[in-house]
Amino acid sequence: MTLTGGAFRKIGFMPIDAKLPQGLSRSFFLPVAEALGFGESRRKCPVIEDLDWLMAGTTRALASVVSGRHFLQTIVEEVASAWERTTYFEALKSKRRLDLLREINEFVCRVTMRTVLPDRLAGIPGLENYDVYAGDGHWHEHATHDPRRGRKGGKGEDKNHRIHVATGHVFGLNLRTRAVVHLAHCDEKTKIKEHDMGVLKRLDRDVLRQGAAKGRKVIWIWDPAGISYTQWYKWKASAGIYFLSRPKTNMIINHVADRPWDKADPINVGVERDGLLTEGPQTPIRLVVFRDPATGKQYKFITNIMDLAPGVIAQLYRMRWDIEKIFDSFKNKLMETKAWAKTTVAKSMQANFMCLATNLATLFEHQIEQEHGVSNAPETKRRAQRREKEKTEVEENGKELPILHQTLVRATQTSVKFIRWLLCHLWKPTSWEAALKPLRRSYATL
């Protein structure tokens, strides 16, 4: 998949949407078929066609299967004709298929989701020229056949003792569209647990820009593991990439030069200080101090973004929690708690299929709501009630909630009810009316 000036170049293959199955699965996988038309790594494979491979891998990420053999014996026959065990596991190690999978998810994130889904940050002033992402690392259990690599050192322990190393990945979440992207697989061969900043420094700047148009700025919101003032300066100066984080617990902040900010603006409710660090970093670093009116807890944020209101800075970091909800969904809804295979390619394949499955589910949930009027209305109502209760309690204490905290009430993840319904009905040859009936009932009663 080629990006030229921010546009994808279509590859000269015949249209393949006719190969899609009928029923719900056709609508669910249609974005994949559309993206395949732009896939440079696409090939005509007589054993496992690329479309079948992509549908099968996405289905495995959605399904609660405990192993590849379990998947082959139960789920895969719904997707395509039965595959040989060795053929499937060899395909998991294919660098070409991994490249194609990345291209497909890239197209779905950068084109389909940006076109179809509403902009969740549209109501925040000052962000018109920014793409905003939350990023973090996520770890799960090693593969069954992973060799013991790490050394468990420490006082009183055998320094030659070999241990299994957990599988780690670094992901990003587009806060405008909820698109999930896989940034990198963490180094397991030389490190027991690679630090987030070590992974970030390995990434090409184009990966961090995520296809942003020339002249457009990109914000990454990270926990304290993403702090490096020197690296922040390099990314900002060379690629227009900005970072927002919270100070590390051992970080001493004594000298701050105050910056002017509008204390009457409802956006800045809760802000106690906005200033520049004047000692330590060579590059300008901004400090925002915020106290949550609901809990009374004080938070400090550091960033190299200088042109956003301090209340916007606080709200953006609050939204970083959305990526933690994605990780919770990986673990407790998709049940992806263990690596599929031992090779680096296969582990990256799994992570990208987890992203693609999540993104397709987000698109499909939106489509069903828009075209059929089916949504999780009871949960939306409960969310609004919780927010109204919080607002009332704060006002009773003589305070007020920040305006952005009141208006940006949104779902942060796809519900487990929808995931269960999707997996149950995805491959059934049933009508939309028959398939949506149990979803309506689930939303209303469960």
Question: Predicted segments — roles?
Answer:
Residues M1-V47, V256, P260-F290, N359-L446:
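A short, flexible helix-boundary coil/loop motif
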Residues L92-L175:
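Active-site-proximal, Lys/Arg-enriched surface segment
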